[in-house]
Amino acid sequence: MTEQLQMTRRTMLAGAALAGAVAPLLHTAQAHAAGAAAAAGAAPVDISTLPRVKVDLVKPPFVHAHDQVAKTGPRVVEFTMTIEEKKLVIDREGTEIHAMTFNGSVPGPLMVVHENDYVELRLINPDTNTLLHNIDFHAATGALGGGALTQVNPGEETTLRFKATKPGVFVYHCAPEGMVPWHVTSGMNGAIMVLPRDGLKDEKGQPLTYDKIYYVGEQDFYVPKDEAGNYKKYETPGEAYEDAVKAMRTLTPTHIVFNGAVGALTGDHALTAAVGERVLVVHSQANRDTRPHLIGGHGDYVWATGKFRNPPDLDQETWLIPGGTAGAAFYTFRQPGVYAYVNHNLIEAFELGAAGHFKVTGEWNDDLMTSVVKPASM
């Protein structure tokens, strides 16, 4: 039996054991919830009576069309994501990994719903893949965030539904028992935004409306090296597993990047805006702390831990997003030019790749900044 098949079988067996352990707990929890609802006089929701909408997800940094304020009552929002194991080049030198992805991108797509909507996800693991996968939504309640109910082997699919009860931005990620770090640091994570039904609010409770939204997924990679210090390449994910674990245990990333690769949000792929545009940036890091900073700008309104029931912090220079969290920052651009958006651990930004650009068009405002004396010889 090859190392790859041994590893795959081990993953499947672990997943089966986990499902067996969780099932009795899940049955007990469901019975308790039903009893509590009956005692409180709350009628169970008849899902069949709710309107349904199908959403086509888009590749980050872009986000699918959505209403900022809910126009109806709660509804069932249907998504489909296909798991894709693929080779991915993560820097300009051609360093290659076996990425594990939701819908083929690192990060996976940003999903947007409103508070008290029902998220219904069809999760597909094609038979072209080699590993068991699942999904853990930090926005969900119960069954390991859905991870215990969504374990799919290659050639299988499943559908999960959960109620989005907490407004905010939240991480989701793959979480197969015993291999969670490997899957997450191979790119298998993303975010979901649960908007308040009446939209975002400032610290005084006044509406905040954005003109554009971008999703930045920060990813730490741990690429094994050979004895000469060169990055290794592997034919299959299973072949890389033991070396990948050794690299992860150093707790020292070889790359920390935005949206899957060094430079993925720079140059022709830079994020764009215009002076006066209000931009919301959702930023997630499923594994490590990060410190977003917009060089030349600020966070006018910031939810660093991403939870919209809390009033935003104002006028932030840098904000801390803990590992395993998504945050959100709202900024109105006031000057044209190129802005660097970075993780302000500057080693991680400039040496490891955690940086992107905003290209902003418009008229320069001398009142905000001007060159009084141009650089010249003394």
Swiss-Prot record:
Binding residues for Cu cation 1: 133, 174, 183, 188
EC number(s) reported in the record: 1.7.2.1
Location relative to the cell: Periplasm
Family: Belongs to the multicopper oxidase family.
GO CC annotation terms, alphabetical: periplasmic space
Pfam families assigned: Cu-oxidase, Cu-oxidase_3
Plastocyanin-like domain: residues covered: 39-213, 214-378
Organism: Achromobacter cycloclastes
Protein name as it appears in the record: Copper-containing nitrite reductase
Residues bound to Cu cation 2: 138, 173, 344
Post-translational changes noted in the entry: Predicted to be exported by the Tat system. The position of the signal peptide cleavage has been experimentally proven.
Annotated pathway: Nitrogen metabolism; nitrate reduction (denitrification); dinitrogen from nitrate: step 2/4
CDD domains membership: CuRO_1_CuNIR
Database matches in PANTHER family: FI03373P-RELATED, MULTI-COPPER OXIDASE
PROSITE patterns to which the protein is assigned, alphabetical: TAT
